[in-house]
Amino acid sequence: MLSDIEISRQSPRLSIQALASRLGIPAHLLSPHGHYKGKLSLELLKQAASKPGKKAGKLVLVSAITPTPLGEGKTVTTLGLSMGLNHIGQPSMATIRQPSLGPVFGVKGGAAGGGHAQVVPMEEMNLHLTGDFHALTAAHNLAAAALDARLFHETKLGTEFTARTGLARLDIDPANILWPRTLDMNERALRHLTIGQGAAADGVERQDRFVITAASELMAILALASDLKDLRARIGRIQLALDSQGQPITAEQLEVAGAMTVLLKDALQPTLMQTTEQTPVLVHAGPFANIAHGNSSVIADRMALQLTDYVVTEAGFGSDMGLEKFFNIKHRQSGITPACVVLVATVRGLKANSGLLDIRPGQPLPASLLGEDLPTLEKGCANLAWHIHNARRYGLPVVVAVNSFPTDSKAELDLLMREARQAGACGAAISTAFVEGGAGASELARAVVAACEMPSQIQLLYPDEMSLCAKLATLVECGYGGRGVILSDKAHRQLAALSAAGWDHLPICVAKTPLSISHDPARKGVPTDFEVPIDEVKLCAGAGFVYALAGPIMTMPGLGSLPAYRHIDIGEDGEIVGLS
């Protein structure tokens, strides 16, 4: 079979103008970036609001079992399903996140799908796209630079600062600067560093750190903002530091919020692209699901729902991660409601979740992972059942998509389908979209159309008025199946301070490992009788949630010993090779 990049290059494409025209988008609301991608104006949403009689489309939320390093094919299934819906005559498009350069050059690779179910051109999708990540990185670091500059000048001028500048002293506490710097790259050396070293003119010496751009609060804000006015207001609320009295200093107080918003003006517009079968795709924002809220943007979803009958969107990692955050954060803030949930499962992924196989990086895969092994698969299906029950907890019908591989036996596929239905899925279908494109997802598409007609009633895990401590406990007990939380002394103090300051109404965004339903990546299948340690709690006032770190979570990844960049190169003809 051809490589992903070879398939991408051979796929027939519409010009971006023709693709937009097919969706009924006026030419003046499209800003082309090259031949096959373009920005869509937010005026599209205003036009839709002026036509109240128009019926909005139905949203399909794609999640998965607990992911493994092998990959379950969630993006392939998301794109394949959108193509499959078009294949059976149901107009559809997809909304997905923009890839981060960190994983592209690290281990995971790109995030454009794969095979015959991918966004094309895949190299443009995976590398820079329309520059949104760079704009966001610049806006984030502008705030960091402004904060350190203000600290420097207030320190240098002392009591004369106000008289010399006409500005009120912010009295920044250098030991309590909350806003890190950011970079869209895996770079472990930037997790802890000292800045301001050198002469007095080189700034105030202090400890600093970097997070990857996808983990920035600004990325969460971009994904959750409803329009430019909302984006500006959210950025103004960002808490950058504390003063010497322990009071927050915001981006508004630093007078940098307006300039940050200016840098993000174009990044607020979703990017229109297409799949290998010319199905439209809106690509926008890119928050990770393990260290952020893990869903594409509110604006892209709303725009797509006005343009077509079915919109397929993807929530990051398993249902305990991106799906939970979709409902308890994204839905809670935006009101966007899916009609059904699709859970992606693979035979090999469920075998890996059985806990019976020894799978280690750099070691040969166990023979039973790639050959028929019904007992191991049956044990691993407990993980599938847990995710089905977890998704149904939110009040929606669940369809299981079995992403099939050539190594799967008929007996294994039959067992998986049977277990899915017994666990409460309203439908289950085998998808071969990777090999066959939309035709390979047609049965899945029919099951999804049927599920979207079923009655549903959204149920969230906790009400707004519940305390932050109670929300954390509820999330662990009901969202992960654990016994409760273990708060560090630091987390205790932080939660008490947030409650006293009136932030109890916000939802919780837990940063934890995606490789287990629990906080421990070694606990496979369906862990029970565990308590989740919460090391630290942070307020994301602009994004509108409280961020809790469950254990030693890295918000700046590092490159592994065998990074993907080793295989990426470019020929004299300008064609990129080795990108996956």
UniProtKB/Swiss-Prot annotation:
Protein name: Formate--tetrahydrofolate ligase
Pathway: One-carbon metabolism; tetrahydrofolate interconversion
Transmembrane annotation, as ranges: none
GO molecular function annotations of the record: ATP binding; formate-tetrahydrofolate ligase activity
Name of the gene this protein is made from: fhs
Organism, as annotated: Aeromonas salmonicida (strain A449)
Enzyme class: ligase
Family per record: Belongs to the formate--tetrahydrofolate ligase family.
Catalysis: reaction(s): (6S)-5,6,7,8-tetrahydrofolate + formate + ATP = (6R)-10-formyltetrahydrofolate + ADP + phosphate
Keywords for the protein's UniProt record, in alphabetical order: ATP-binding, Ligase, Nucleotide-binding, One-carbon metabolism
Pfam families: FTHFS
Enzyme Commission number(s): 6.3.4.3
GO BP term, pick one: tetrahydrofolate interconversion
Residues involved in ATP binding: 68-75
